[in-house]
Amino acid sequence: MPHPRCLIASLLAAITLALAACSTDTAGKDAVAVGGTFQFHSPGGETVITYPEADRKPIADITGPSVTDPNTDVKLADYQDKIVVLNAWGQWCGPCRTEVDDLEEVQEHLAKTGGTVIGINVKDTQSLAKDFIQDNGITYPSIYDPPFKLAASLGGIPASVVPTTIVLDKQHRPAVVFLRQITAQELLDAIKPLETA
């Protein structure tokens, strides 16, 4: 009989793939959601999607209240012509807690050229989200968006999949989308070709 942890891991993987592929095209092969000018596709329920430069389209500008200071807005437009990594997270999410150090490493890299990671906190109370940021020494800004309304602005990224990480090129077009936990090396590998473009 398989070990209970293996069964749980298999079940969680199946649920993640099911959530990532929650709507399908007529052939049943692609998860598709549409919003703004960028159209999100997850071919066959893939959890890492790369967009060639010729196929990239901009997302709508996003802005929202800061988790740490609700009187201040975090704005994508403040990083014009800079690479930005968007990350939907929640302090309740195990993979989100695991990847926070990786995101901080990427933030340190991007900050050298004026880029940033922008977190989008979902499904938390503001005090829990703020405590998580302070307790983990997170230096990048986060938007407080508990119902994840920004998902529509992000081209229909599935609001049910957390963490979700989107690497935007300098024109703020999605270059790579991760519908799962990431590592710093994966993000740096995705960012490197965008830095010279």
Give the predicted meaning of each segment.
Residues 1-65, 197:
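N-terminal targeting signals for export/organelle localization
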Residues 57-59, 79-81, 112-115, 127, ...:
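Extracytoplasmic
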Residues 85-86, 117:
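Hydrophobic beta-strand anchors of alpha/beta hydrolase catalytic cores
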Residues 87-93:
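Aromatic-flanked redox-active Cys/Sec active sites in thiol-based oxidoreductases
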Residues 97-136, 146-153:
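Structural microenvironment flanking redox-active thiols in thiol-disulfide oxidoreductases
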Residues 131-139, 145-197:
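Thiol/disulfide oxidoreductase modules built on the thioredoxin-like
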